[in-house]
Swiss-Prot record:
SMART domains: SprT. GO terms for biological process: response to stress. Residues 7-148 form the SprT-like domain. It is found in: Cytoplasm. The active site is at residue 68. GO terms for cellular component: cytoplasm. This is Protein SprT-like. InterPro entries: SprT-like_domain, SprT_Zn_ribbon, Uncharacterised_SprT-like. Zn(2+) binds at residues 67, 71. The keyword Iron does not apply. Keywords: Cytoplasm, Metal-binding, Zinc.
């Protein structure tokens, strides 16, 4: 799906569910990480997360578009467009738009796990962050720590 297709989709959804035209720009924003989309108050444009389209398909994207169009049309009309406003929640129900988008399935960034062992008492420590073994000692017996295993 490219920029023209997303623009056309937003315009169609706006006419179909809201009965009003969408007169601004809709685009994908690759910098969005944790949100499905956002409505920009200054420019009245809508930005959408392309990864949601890749992961969940067109149905989820249409739901996100409906949610952002609720912000858009209420803001243009001068009514309550924020998530906590009654007008916004009522319009969400009327057009069957989701209040929140699905959670993004995170691509794990290779979680590193460091395992240290005390040379005196053999107590093992599992940490996500590397520690300076010259500076830190065992909390139980004050023995020297050594790195046993590093998994990534």
């Amino acid at each position: 799906m490219d920029e023209q297709e997303i623009q056309r989709l937003v315009e169609e959804v706006s006419l179909q569910y809201f009965g009003m035209p969408f007169l601004h720009k809709a685009m994908f924003n690759s910098r969005l990480r944790t949100t499905g989309g956002r409505y920009l108050l200054n420019t009245h444009n809508i930005e959408l997360n392309y990864r949601y389209y890749e992961m969940y398909g067109k149905e989820e994207l249409v739901g996100i578009v409906k949610h952002e169009l609720c912000h858009y049309h209420l803001h243009i009309a001068g009514r309550g467009y924020k998530h906590r406003d009654k007008d916004f929640r009522e319009l969400l129900k009327a057009v069957d738009a989701p209040r929140f988008c699905k959670r993004m399935i995170n691509e794990e960034k290779g979680k590193k796990v460091y395992m240290y062992e005390c040379m005196e008492c053999s107590l093992q420590y599992v940490r996500r962050r590397q520690i300076n073994t010259k500076r830190y000692v065992c909390g139980k017996c004050k023995g020297k720590l050594i790195l046993i295993k590093k998994t990534s």
